[in-house]
C-alpha cells in the first residue's frame, strides 16, 4: 500500500498496521508472475551483475526480490537450497509468539540457563550477562532477533521442543522447503549438498512476507515481531548500507565461519511506502575455510533494490 507521506519511520510503519491490507492485496496480484520466476531475459542487466559477482567472489548467489506495489521482481537461483544460518531466528521467535504465548502471559515467564548453555552456543552477547537471573521469553526473543544471540535462540528452540519445531512451523505456514535440524552453532556448518538447515531465497522471502505482511500471526504479535526486526542491530553496517537512503527495513541476517555463508532476509519499505521483499543467500561450496562475505551482501542489497525499485 502506498502511503501519502514522503518517508516512513519505524513508528509510522507499526502505527499504520504495517500496511497489511494493501500490501497483502498487492502481493496476491503479483503472485502468479513472481511464482513463475523471472528469467534472465526479463532483467538481463541485473542478472549479468549477479553472475559477475558470483565470479568475482567465487560464490553461489541466490536472490529473490519483489516490489509488492509494482510487481517488479528479480530471481536468481531462487529455488535452490542454501544454508539458512541465523535467518531462522525470526521463525523461532514467531513460532514462540504463535504457539506458546496464546494468552500473552508466557512472554513474561523467566527462563533459567547455565554458563554451559552460554559457552556452547558460541555467541551470546546478551545472555552472557544474565546467567544469574535468567531472562524472560520476551527478552530472549529480542536478543535472538536484534543481537543474533545463539544462546537465546537455543533456549527458544528448547521451549518449542527442538529445532524440528521450526520446520513444522514453516509447513503450517505453507512453506514446504525451509527446514531446521540442528542447534546453534552446528547449524551454520554449511557443508555443500547438505539438505539439513536449509532454505531457498523464494521460500524464506515468502515466509517472512506471511509473518510481517500477512496474517500468520495475530496483529499484536505481528507488530512485536516486526518491531524487533526493524530494530535489528546486526545489519546496520552491512545489508542496510547497500540500500537507498530513506528506506525502512525489517530484516535478519545470518552467516557462518565456513564456506563463505552470508545471508539476508528483509521486508523493506521505500520512502513512499511500497513494500519490497529482499532476500539474498550466498555460499562458497569450494572454499571450506572462507568466512561470510559481508562486502558481497552489501553489493547485493544495491543490486536488488535497483532492480525492483529504481530511483
UniProtKB/Swiss-Prot annotation:
Family from the record: Belongs to the class-A beta-lactamase family.
Signal peptide start-end: 1-36
UniProt GO BP: beta-lactam antibiotic catabolic process; response to antibiotic
Organism: Streptomyces cellulosae
Active site: 86
Catalytic reaction list: a beta-lactam + H2O = a substituted beta-amino acid
PROSITE patterns tied to this protein: BETA_LACTAMASE_A (PS00146), TAT (PS51318)
Entry EC no(s): 3.5.2.6
Disulfide bonds: none
Molecular functions (GO terms): beta-lactamase activity
NCBIfam families referenced in this protein's UniProt entry, alphabetically: bla_class_A (NF033103)
Protein name: Beta-lactamase
Amino acid at each position: 500500500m502506498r502511503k501519502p507521506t514522503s518517508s516512513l519511520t519505524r513508528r509510522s510503519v507499526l502505527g499504520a498496521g504495517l500496511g497489511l491490507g494493501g500490501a497483502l492485496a498487492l502481493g496476491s496480484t503479483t503472485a502468479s508472475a513472481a511464482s513463475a520466476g523471472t528469467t534472465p531475459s526479463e532483467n538481463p542487466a541485473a542478472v549479468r551483475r549477479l553472475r559477475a559477482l558470483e565470479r568475482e567472489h567465487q560464490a553461489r548467489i541466490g536472490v529473490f526480490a519483489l516490489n509488492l506495489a509494482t510487481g517488479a521482481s528479480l530471481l536468481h537461483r531462487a529455488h535452490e537450497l542454501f544454508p539458512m544460518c541465523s535467518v531462522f531466528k525470526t521463525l523461532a521467535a514467531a513460532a514462540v509468539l504463535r504457539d506458546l504465548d496464546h494468552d500473552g502471559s508466557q512472554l513474561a515467564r523467566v527462563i533459567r540457563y547455565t554458563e554451559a548453555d552460554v559457552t556452547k552456543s558460541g555467541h551470546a552477547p546478551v545472555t552472557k550477562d544474565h546467567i544469574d537471573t535468567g531472562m524472560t521469553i520476551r527478552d530472549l526473543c529480542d536478543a535472538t532477533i536484534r543481537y543474533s544471540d545463539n544462546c537465546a535462540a537455543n533456549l527458544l528452540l528448547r521451549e518449542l521442543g527442538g529445532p524440528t519445531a521450526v520446520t513444522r512451523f514453516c509447513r503450517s505456514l505453507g512453506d514446504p522447503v525451509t527446514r531446521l535440524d540442528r542447534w546453534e552453532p552446528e547449524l551454520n556448518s554449511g557443508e555443500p549438498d547438505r539438505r539439513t538447515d536449509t532454505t531457498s531465497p523464494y521460500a524464506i522471502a515468502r515466509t517472512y512476507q506471511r509473518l510481517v505482511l500477512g496474517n500468520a500471526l495475530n496483529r499484536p504479535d505481528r507488530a512485536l515481531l516486526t518491531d524487533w526486526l526493524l530494530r535489528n542491530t546486526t545489519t546496520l553496517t552491512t545489508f542496510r548500507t547497500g540500500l537507498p537512503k530513506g528506506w525502512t527495513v525489517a530484516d535478519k541476517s545470518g552467516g557462518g565461519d565456513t564456506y563463505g555463508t552470508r545471508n539476508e532476509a528483509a521486508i523493506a519499505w521505500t520512502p513512499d511506502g511500497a513494500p519490497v521483499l529482499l532476500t539474498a543467500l550466498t555460499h562458497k561450496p569450494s572454499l571450506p575455510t572462507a568466512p561470510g562475505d559481508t562486502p558481497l551482501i552489501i553489493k547485493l542489497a544495491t543490486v536488488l533494490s535497483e532492480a525492483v525499485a529504481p530511483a
